[in-house]
UniProtKB/Swiss-Prot annotation:
Gene Ontology terms describing biological process: proteolysis; ribosome biogenesis
Protein name: Ribosomal processing cysteine protease Prp
Active-site residues from the entry: H22 (proton donor), C34 (nucleophile)
Outcome recorded upon mutating C34S: No peptidase activity, binds substrate
Amino acid sequence: MITVDITVNDEGKVTDVIMDGHADHGEYGHDIVCAGASAVLFGSVNAIIGLTSERPDINYDDNGGHFHIRSVDTNNDEAQLILQTMLVSLQTIEEEYNENIRLNYK
């Protein structure tokens, strides 16, 4: 199962997103849950870097299964909007594939 741990500060701003695990919905290379979640995450990170002044701290495993993004500037409204959009997309995947992906808010 993919777990997505989301840390939100007292102001409701996303500070950390950690995605761990594997969806195990299909064969390696043919897992639509993994592909969807990965596309949402990587697309969002690329949008933050390409469209805003935010430069988040990023840590990931080259072999897959772990990605951590930490917001450096939680007052960057554009980056926060992209992060919130990412979470809505991941929630949509979770609603359909709740045995393969779980979002946890902290």
